């Protein structure tokens, strides 16, 4: 009898266990597609980024011109740039939906995979931030100046830390060079951590919408879920191509069409849309250090979610009260995103402060207490 090479070859065996013969719960829904979509986004970003890096010049006198050169003179350079820019937005859409699914269905109880996922989110945000600086437009320069300046809020070492990151006394050539180096390096670190993320996930197997043990009802990943994932790929690639080809500047800031000028400050300094919720939390606290700590905590609060799980049930599917507060959290995050893009004036300041308090309260108090109450209602002692 002929042996199947994918089941015996040392390398193919790993791929087989991860992508072909992987036992998957039969009832996982479309919300489980986003893991593979994140993989697609990462591969697309690395490939387009590699081609862009071949023509980009990390020097303040040439960076802006080199981006124009890519858009005008390089074969399909405009397409690579548009896909790379929109790819970042799609990456964040997918990761936020992936996290929301994890929160709703209790996937965070697989603590190792969840914690590595939070680290991946942080690395993705760092990569996107340093990447946004590279075109060296007005918003690139001032965004870099404002965000790196936040480190000066830390007592004693703050100013030293800022100058160390800048490589001088202001955002200058040294800053751009190192940001390019970080932007090139970090995606490969994300790729390595993604493999570890998948490794930990496959130790226990995927969660499912019911939040119960599904060992008695598993089907192979291929062909059932591989085709389902391909359908997701098709939708994302279609949307990405439509936006990149028909609306290339929809999400870009108009200020970034102006070369960086340290003497002229833009009217509203704001990051890309995917950072606005954290930026709104930062702005809602009048104290500089307090704002920076709140900004960091708005992301790292996800690490506390497994510790704050008080329910006897894993998934939210049978917990109507927790569902209400979960959707309140989603709405709250959308409100914070909107507030982050508004000028610093009333009533936006007050709305931002209320939404920031609600954001942390829902995570730390409201959802854990509601879950505990539901245990009592259902007599789950």
UniProtKB/Swiss-Prot annotation:
Its cofactor is heme b. Heme b b566 binds at residues 98, 197. The keyword Transmembrane applies. The keyword Transmembrane helix applies. It is a multi-pass membrane protein. It holds the Pfam family Cytochrome_B. PROSITE patterns: CYTB_CTER, CYTB_NTER. InterPro entries: Cyt_b/b6_C, Cyt_b/b6_C_sf, Cyt_b/b6_N, Cytb/b6-like_sf, Cytochrome_b, Cytochrome_b_C_euk/bac, Cytochrome_b_N_euk/bac, Di-haem_cyt_TM. The chain crosses the membrane at residues 34-54, 78-99, 114-134, 179-199, 227-247, 289-309, 321-341, 348-368. GO terms for biological process: mitochondrial electron transport, ubiquinol to cytochrome c. A ubiquinone binds at residue 202. Keywords: Electron transport, Heme, Iron, Membrane, Metal-binding, Mitochondrion, Mitochondrion inner membrane, Respiratory chain, Transmembrane, Transmembrane helix, Transport, Ubiquinone. GO terms for molecular function: metal ion binding; ubiquinol-cytochrome-c reductase activity. Heme 1 (or BL or b562) is low-potential and absorbs at about 562 nm, and heme 2 (or BH or b566) is high-potential and absorbs at about 566 nm. This is Cytochrome b. It comes from Scyliorhinus canicula. The gene is mt-cyb.
């Amino acid at each position: 009898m002929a042996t199947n090479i994918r089941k015996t070859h040392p390398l193919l065996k790993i791929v087989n266990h991860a992508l072909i013969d992987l036992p998957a719960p039969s009832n996982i829904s479309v919300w489980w597609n986003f893991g593979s979509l994140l993989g697609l986004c990462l591969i697309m970003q690395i490939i387009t980024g590699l081609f862009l890096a071949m023509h980009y010049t990390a020097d303040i006198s040439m960076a802006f011109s080199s981006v124009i050169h890519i858009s005008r003179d390089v074969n399909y350079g405009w397409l690579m740039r548009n896909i790379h820019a929109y790819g970042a937005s799609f990456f964040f859409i997918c990761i936020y939906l992936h996290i929301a699914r994890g929160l709703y269905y209790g996937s965070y109880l697989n603590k190792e995979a969840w914690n590595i996922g939070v680290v991946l989110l942080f690395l993705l945000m760092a990569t996107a931030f340093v990447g946004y600086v590279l075109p060296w437009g007005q918003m690139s320069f001032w965004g870099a100046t404002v965000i790196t300046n936040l480190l000066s809020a830390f007592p004693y070492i703050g100013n030293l830390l800022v100058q160390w990151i800048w490589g001088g006394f202001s955002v200058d050539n040294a800053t751009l060079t190192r940001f390019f180096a970080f932007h090139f390096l970090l995606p490969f670190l994300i790729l390595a951590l993604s493999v570890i993320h998948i490794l930990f996930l496959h130790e226990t197997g995927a969660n499912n919408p019911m939040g119960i043990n599904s060992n008695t009802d598993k089907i192979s990943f291929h062909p059932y879920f591989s085709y389902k994932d391909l359908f997701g790929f098709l939708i994302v690639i279609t949307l990405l191509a439509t936006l990149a080809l028909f609306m290339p500047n929809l999400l870009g800031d108009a200020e970034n069409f102006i070369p960086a000028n340290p003497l002229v400050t833009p009217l509203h300094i704001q990051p890309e849309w995917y950072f606005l919720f954290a930026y709104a939390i930062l702005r809602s606290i009048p104290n500089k250090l307090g704002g920076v700590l709140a900004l960091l905590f708005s992301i790292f609060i996800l690490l506390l979610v497994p510790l704050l799980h008080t329910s006897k049930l894993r998934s939210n599917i049978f917990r109507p009260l927790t569902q209400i507060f979960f959707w309140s959290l989603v709405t709250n995050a959308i409100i914070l995103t909107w507030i982050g893009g508004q000028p610093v004036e009333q009533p936006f300041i007050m709305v931002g402060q209320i939404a920031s308090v609600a954001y942390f309260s829902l995570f730390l108090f409201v959802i854990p207490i509601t879950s505990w109450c539901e245990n009592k209602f259902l007599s789950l002692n």
